[in-house]
């Protein structure tokens, strides 16, 4: 069955003549006008049956609930398919669909008639959608263990709204997105929950071109290999995020990557966490690879004797790796992986008021971390999800988070609590293909303190279970690199020269000698610059000067020093600045200060390849 679904201000249609002998009988055909309605143009295909009809109506009703519309017109529309069912079957299934939708204000246009029509479609992100519904639409892979939370994620009742910084909430169908195009993309992407990849985003080509990462064909899909350049970048981001979390007060730990699937806490948690896991059999024991740091940290916290005076108490781990068996059609580049590196900080709080106060601190931390990583607030949009009860009891706290963001946010409100958390927010990056990916996130978890037997003693010397916050201030490290590359691709599209933040550049300065007679000078200069904690290399290959400069440009190296007789005899350095395209002379000290201004406060590591390009192998990607 194929469906084109439109949320309309109005539709007018007029039956003009019968197309087939078995067309529906109607008396006195007249123009019909319907307003504020969802119109489902439906083509019943050969092989469709009652199960398909029920599934189709279920999907239509689910999307109508999200936009707050209860008025439906079923419009038979054969032009959507070339594989139509027999007219008798089609009419019967349309009647079944209308019956299944009897709790709505439902009607249908006559079957088998030629009709003229005029339709006015609304302009919000969910106003237009298409569906292909088959008997297998809801079938899952036989070898896939799927949590109850994951199964329920597609059926949970959600209300989608937009909240402004002043706290007002508007139904998504009534919001004017004209000044918030990225938020509109996020709203459509999240509410439709379509993660399929149609084409690779630009960062995939860039991660290969810059020798950062590539697919590993000898591994499972979604498991990447990082070349020396990529490992250097990744390690610096890991160190920076870890340093910031430790400054915030997180205590770093290390926990196993696999756990007993039959451990009571694990079984219960599986069914409250929306993720697919890798399963392992070891000597008859069923194990799974962790999909977050929660398990190890919670089992560790179970061994602590805590007082309310210790709270909020924060544990932190950088998981290398966390594993999630994302569906194969959703995997692409560094955006969505099956093995990824996740900074994960849990805060154990006394109660909801303390958790609400702490989540504000972590919100500020997350904004700051992203900014220092090279991702500004204008680069992402915020989504926040909560239960209706939690919103009613903590409205001002939620509004404060939105006010901190400073722009309208996407809201998903749940009628009832289905997951272990009652609130979750995330910052979502929108890439060049209009796909959203969560970076920073935090959750308020009201179940796992009890589930894992974690306790603290309150003011009355009574044992209590803590509220737990789940924060990743950056999101997966791989996604940070993805976002930086997508930003660079967007800059290139706008005519700007793409670049990485200087502190993450695998090579920050390249020295190119004009002739072999300047090699000693270049090597000494290289050592002098390197001693200032700057990643510098020497292109001593037997290639033309033009080719070596072009290749440095292709590697996005910000500073190029071409050394000839004039430069070797000068007290100043002649610097080619990639961003301006200009060559300028500066003193050594001024040049070092310029670099330091861009890298100050960030971790440093030396080159992850030979200092001389002549000694490097050529990477074939």
Swiss-Prot record:
<dbReference type="GO" id="GO:0008270">
    <property type="term" value="F:zinc ion binding"/>
</dbReference>
<dbReference type="InterPro" id="IPR036621">
    <property type="entry name" value="Anticodon-bd_dom_sf"/>
</dbReference>
<dbReference type="GO" id="GO:0005737">
    <property type="term" value="C:cytoplasm"/>
</dbReference>
<keyword id="KW-0030">Aminoacyl-tRNA synthetase</keyword>
<feature type="compositionally biased region" description="Polar residues">
    <location>
        <begin position="598"/>
        <end position="612"/>
    </location>
</feature>
<dbReference type="InterPro" id="IPR047246">
    <property type="entry name" value="ThrRS_anticodon"/>
</dbReference>
<feature type="region of interest" description="Catalytic">
    <location>
        <begin position="202"/>
        <end position="501"/>
    </location>
</feature>
<feature type="region of interest" description="Editing domain">
    <location>
        <begin position="1"/>
        <end position="137"/>
    </location>
</feature>
<dbReference type="Pfam" id="PF08915">
    <property type="entry name" value="tRNA-Thr_ED"/>
</dbReference>
<dbReference type="GO" id="GO:0005524">
    <property type="term" value="F:ATP binding"/>
</dbReference>
<dbReference type="GO" id="GO:0004829">
    <property type="term" value="F:threonine-tRNA ligase activity"/>
</dbReference>
<feature type="binding site">
    <location>
        <position position="470"/>
    </location>
    <ligand>
        <name>Zn(2+)</name>
    </ligand>
</feature>
<dbReference type="InterPro" id="IPR045864">
    <property type="entry name" value="aa-tRNA-synth_II/BPL/LPL"/>
</dbReference>
<dbReference type="InterPro" id="IPR006195">
    <property type="entry name" value="aa-tRNA-synth_II"/>
</dbReference>
<dbReference type="InterPro" id="IPR002320">
    <property type="entry name" value="Thr-tRNA-ligase_IIa"/>
</dbReference>
<dbReference type="GO" id="GO:0000049">
    <property type="term" value="F:tRNA binding"/>
</dbReference>
<keyword id="KW-0862">Zinc</keyword>
<keyword id="KW-0547">Nucleotide-binding</keyword>
<feature type="binding site">
    <location>
        <position position="294"/>
    </location>
    <ligand>
        <name>Zn(2+)</name>
    </ligand>
</feature>
<keyword id="KW-0479">Metal-binding</keyword>
<keyword id="KW-0963">Cytoplasm</keyword>
<keyword id="KW-0436">Ligase</keyword>
<keyword id="KW-0648">Protein biosynthesis</keyword>
<feature type="binding site">
    <location>
        <position position="346"/>
    </location>
    <ligand>
        <name>Zn(2+)</name>
    </ligand>
</feature>
<dbReference type="InterPro" id="IPR002314">
    <property type="entry name" value="aa-tRNA-synt_IIb"/>
</dbReference>
<keyword id="KW-0694">RNA-binding</keyword>
<comment type="subunit">
    <text>Homodimer.</text>
</comment>
<dbReference type="InterPro" id="IPR004154">
    <property type="entry name" value="Anticodon-bd"/>
</dbReference>
<dbReference type="Pfam" id="PF03129">
    <property type="entry name" value="HGTP_anticodon"/>
</dbReference>
<feature type="region of interest" description="Disordered">
    <location>
        <begin position="598"/>
        <end position="621"/>
    </location>
</feature>
<protein>
    <recommendedName>
        <fullName>Threonine--tRNA ligase</fullName>
        <ecNumber>6.1.1.3</ecNumber>
    </recommendedName>
</protein>
<dbReference type="InterPro" id="IPR023509">
    <property type="entry name" value="DTD-like_sf"/>
</dbReference>
<dbReference type="GO" id="GO:0006435">
    <property type="term" value="P:threonyl-tRNA aminoacylation"/>
</dbReference>
<keyword id="KW-0820">tRNA-binding</keyword>
<comment type="function">
    <text>Catalyzes the attachment of threonine to tRNA(Thr) in a two-step reaction: L-threonine is first activated by ATP to form Thr-AMP and then transferred to the acceptor end of tRNA(Thr). Also edits incorrectly charged L-seryl-tRNA(Thr).</text>
</comment>
<dbReference type="InterPro" id="IPR015011">
    <property type="entry name" value="Threonyl-tRNA_syn_edit_dom_arc"/>
</dbReference>
<feature type="region of interest" description="Disordered">
    <location>
        <begin position="128"/>
        <end position="150"/>
    </location>
</feature>
<comment type="similarity">
    <text>Belongs to the class-II aminoacyl-tRNA synthetase family.</text>
</comment>
<keyword id="KW-0067">ATP-binding</keyword>
<dbReference type="Pfam" id="PF00587">
    <property type="entry name" value="tRNA-synt_2b"/>
</dbReference>
């Amino acid at each position: 069955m194929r469906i084109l679904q439109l949320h309309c201000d109005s539709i007018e249609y007029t039956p003009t003549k019968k197309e087939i002998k078995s067309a529906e009988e109607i008396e006195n055909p007249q123009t019909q006008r319907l307003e504020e309605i969802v119109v489902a143009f439906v083509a019943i295909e050969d092989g469709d049956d009652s199960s398909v009809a029920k599934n189709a109506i279920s999907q239509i009703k689910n999307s109508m609930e999200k936009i707050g519309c209860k008025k439906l017109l079923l419009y038979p529309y054969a032009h959507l398919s070339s594989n139509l069912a027999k007219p008798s079957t089609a009419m019967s299934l349309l009647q079944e669909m209308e019956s299944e939708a009897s709790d709505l204000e439902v009607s249908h246009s006559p079957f088998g008639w030629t009709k003229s029509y005029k339709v006015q479609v609304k302009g919000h992100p969910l106003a237009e959608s298409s569906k292909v519904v088959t008997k297998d639409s809801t079938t899952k892979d036989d070898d896939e263990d799927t949590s109850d939370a994951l199964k329920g994620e597609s059926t949970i009742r959600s209300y989608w709204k937009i909240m402004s910084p002043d706290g007002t909430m508007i139904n998504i169908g009534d919001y004017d997105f004209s000044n918030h195009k990225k938020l509109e993309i996020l709203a459509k992407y999240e509410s439709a929950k379509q993660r399929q990849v149609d084409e690779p985003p630009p960062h995939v080509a860039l991660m290969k071109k810059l020798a950062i990462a590539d697919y590993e064909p000898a591994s499972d899909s979604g498991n990447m290999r990082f070349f020396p350049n990529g490992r250097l970048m990744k390690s610096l981001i890991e160190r920076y995020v870890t340093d910031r979390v430790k400054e915030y007060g997180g205590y770093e730990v290390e926990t196993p990557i696999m756990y007993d699937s039959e451990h009571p806490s694990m079984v219960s948690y599986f069914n409250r966490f929306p993720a697919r896991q890798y399963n392992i059999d070891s000597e008859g024991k069923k194990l799974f690879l962790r999909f977050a740091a929660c398990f190890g940290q919670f089992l560790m916290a179970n061994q602590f004797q805590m007082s309310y005076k210790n709270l909020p108490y924060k544990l932190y781990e950088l998981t290398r790796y966390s594993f999630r068996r994302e569906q194969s059609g959703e995997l692409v580049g560094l955006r969505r992986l099956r093995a990824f590196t996740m900074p994960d900080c849990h805060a154990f709080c006394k109660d909801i008021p303390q958790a609400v106060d702490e989540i504000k601190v972590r919100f500020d931390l997350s904004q700051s971390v992203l900014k220092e990583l090279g991702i500004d607030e204008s680069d992402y949009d915020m989504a926040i999800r909560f239960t209706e009860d939690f919103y009613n009891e903590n409205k001002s706290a939620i509004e404060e988070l939105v006010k901190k963001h400073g722009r309208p946010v996407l809201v998903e409100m749940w009628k009832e609590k289905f997951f272990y958390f009652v609130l979750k927010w995330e910052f979502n990056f929108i890439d060049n293909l209009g796909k959203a990916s969560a970076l920073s996130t935090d959750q308020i978890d009201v179940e796992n303190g009890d589930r894992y037997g974690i306790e603290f003693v309150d003011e009355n010397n009574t044992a209590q279970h803590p509220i737990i916050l789940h924060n990743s201030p950056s999101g997966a490290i791989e996604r940070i690199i993805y976002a930086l590359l997508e930003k660079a691709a967007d800059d290139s599209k706008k005519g700007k020269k793409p670049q990485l933040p200087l502190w993450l550049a695998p090579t920050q300065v390249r020295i190119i000698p004009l002739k072999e007679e300047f090699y000693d000078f270049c090597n000494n200069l290289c050592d002098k610059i390197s001693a200032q904690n700057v990643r510098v290399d020497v292109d001593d290959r037997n290639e033309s000067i033009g080719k070596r400069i072009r290749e440095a440009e292709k590697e996005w190296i910000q500073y190029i020093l071409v050394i000839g007789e004039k430069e070797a005899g000068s007290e100043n350095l002649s610097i080619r600045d990639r961003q301006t395209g200009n060559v300028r002379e500066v003193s050594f000290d001024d040049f070092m200060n310029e670099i330091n201004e861009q890298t100050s406060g960030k971790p440093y590591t030396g080159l992850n390849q030979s200092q001389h390009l002549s000694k490097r192998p050529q990477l074939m990607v």
